[in-house]
Amino acid sequence: MTTAITPDKKKLVSPKPTKTTSDKSKTKPRRSSKTSKKRKSKKGLFGCCAKKRKTKRSKKSAKRTKRSAPKKAPKKAPMKAPSKPAAKLVPQQAQASLQKPIQSGIVDADATVKTVVPRPPTPIPPTGVKPEPAPRSEPLYQPRSVSSTTPRTSATTGTTEQMVTAPATLPPPSAESKHLPQDPPGDASSPRVQRQYTAEKYSKEDQDDDDQKDLRKSVAYPSHKFFMTQYVKDECRVRRWVYEDSVPLMMESNMKHMLRMASNRIAACQSDKARRCDMMKDLNEMTEILDGNF
């Protein structure tokens, strides 16, 4: 049999609707996770955790077993005290014989304590005789009474008295005088302390004055104007620090001294021609030096 193949029928496709401003695409609302959590948690915030905790606890409690009591150490038998020897029975007669000497010894001691030796009666002095006083212990030396060396005049007293002189020999100093306590340190109000304070004060003031003087001198006479000079005096060379204002006087004194020495040498060597020539050379050199300076 021959079958005729018919062409496929075209599917009827509905025309696509054109989008307009009025039409809006509708999407399914997304379920939030919070709602599902809220549905699960029926017992507050940590309900799910509480369920897990319960299951864990139930498992642990099932595993637990009752603890066995610790083994007790075996009790040791108490140590027996060493047995004392049984007291021997002593008959009553023997006990009485043992106690007798002890009692007799006690009685003898009491008797010795009670025996008192009678003292002889003190002699009563007769009524007419006075008892002698006990001897007094005299001191090492008697202190001297303070007395004035000048005689009292008749103006003060009715009669004049003789002058009291010091004893010729003084007693030796005793060892007690060495250990006498010294005077305590004076207070601030004592004159000695005040004198010391004033002395220190004045010494400080003097030192301040000296410092002020040194400052004034350093201002009036600066150090760069000082220089050392030397001159001859009594056939000795003298060196001094001299201020520049006094230089002409020092130079003049040096010149006078040198001229004097030269004249003395010339007078001494007038007879010797060679020495005189040497002296003239020295004088010429000195004149050249002085002419160059001035």
UniProtKB/Swiss-Prot annotation:
Per UniProt, the ranges with Pro residues bias are 118-136
Composition bias type Low complexity, residue spans: 79-88, 145-160
Q: Where is this region: Disordered?
A: 1-215
Task: Give the source's domain of life in one word.
Answer: Eukaryota
**Which residue ranges have biased composition labelled Polar residues?**
92-102
Chain segments annotated as transmembrane? none
Q: Please list the residue ranges that the record marks as compositionally biased, kind Basic residues.
A: 27-43, 50-78
The coiled-coil regions, if any, are: none
Protein name (database record):
Uncharacterized protein C45G9.9
Which species expresses this protein natively?
Answer: Caenorhabditis elegans
